[in-house]
């Protein structure tokens, strides 16, 4: 996809790149040539799944400094794909509900798009698959995704240390766990430093 981006557009992980990736996944799912590409939830459906019907959603983007990037990568034990962090805040009737981040990662050879829902206390509440462009046998089940949720040490989100494997899906497990750790570490570093 990067070959189709205009010069000057930040690649891999920038808010525009993530949006374009999500739209590309939607188009790929609509193509008769891409029978295995599957969009599971549109963005508005995902936000409703995260915060419930009637929530007000606002988008925020933070620039990540080189010092913050180093701290996030050390905490997450993975590399960041962007120097920007885009997240959404959900509110209903003035009450803060939490955060959501839409991320995309290459699993084996194709893109998966997922959303990480985080409480106001920075605990992962849900991980929701939005699009999965690999064969269905590599797609994690909802019960597997629940391993990524809850208040647990970051090392428990590392494959082989706290996550059960998915037979034949090591790259899927690695991609999703890397993404969730990066989101969680980004919140811990960026929001605790001064929201």
What are these regions (language model features)?
Residues 1-15:
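N-terminal secretory signal peptides that target proteins for export/translocation
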Residues 2, 34-35:
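…; additionally, a secondary subgroup of soluble metalloenzymes is captured
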Residues 7, 29-34:
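Short intrinsically disordered, low-complexity segments
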Residues 15-31:
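Bacterial N-terminal signal peptides
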Residues 35-174, 178-195:
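Flexible, solvent-exposed loop/hinge segments and secondary-structure transition points
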């Amino acid at each position: 996809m990067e070959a189709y981006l205009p010069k000057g557009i930040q690649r891999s992980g920038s808010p525009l790149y993530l949006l374009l990736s999500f739209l590309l996944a939607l188009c790929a799912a609509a193509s008769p040539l891409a029978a295995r590409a599957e969009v599971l939830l549109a963005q508005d459906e995902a936000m409703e799944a995260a915060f419930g019907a009637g929530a007000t959603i606002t988008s925020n983007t933070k620039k990540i400094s080189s010092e913050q990037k180093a701290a996030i990568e050390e905490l997450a034990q993975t590399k960041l794909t962007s120097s920007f962090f885009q997240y959404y805040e959900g509110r209903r009737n003035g009450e803060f509900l939490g955060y959501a981040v839409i991320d995309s990662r290459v699993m084996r050879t194709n893109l998966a798009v997922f959303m990480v829902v985080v409480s106001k206390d920075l605990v992962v509440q849900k991980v929701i698959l939005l699009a999965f462009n690999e064969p269905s046998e590599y797609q994690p089940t909802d019960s597997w995704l629940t391993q990524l949720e809850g208040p647990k040490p970051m090392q428990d989100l590392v494959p082989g240390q706290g996550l059960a494997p998915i037979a034949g899906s090591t790259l899927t497990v690695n991609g999703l766990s890397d993404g969730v750790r990066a989101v969680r570490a980004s919140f811990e570093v960026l929001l605790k430093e001064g929201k």
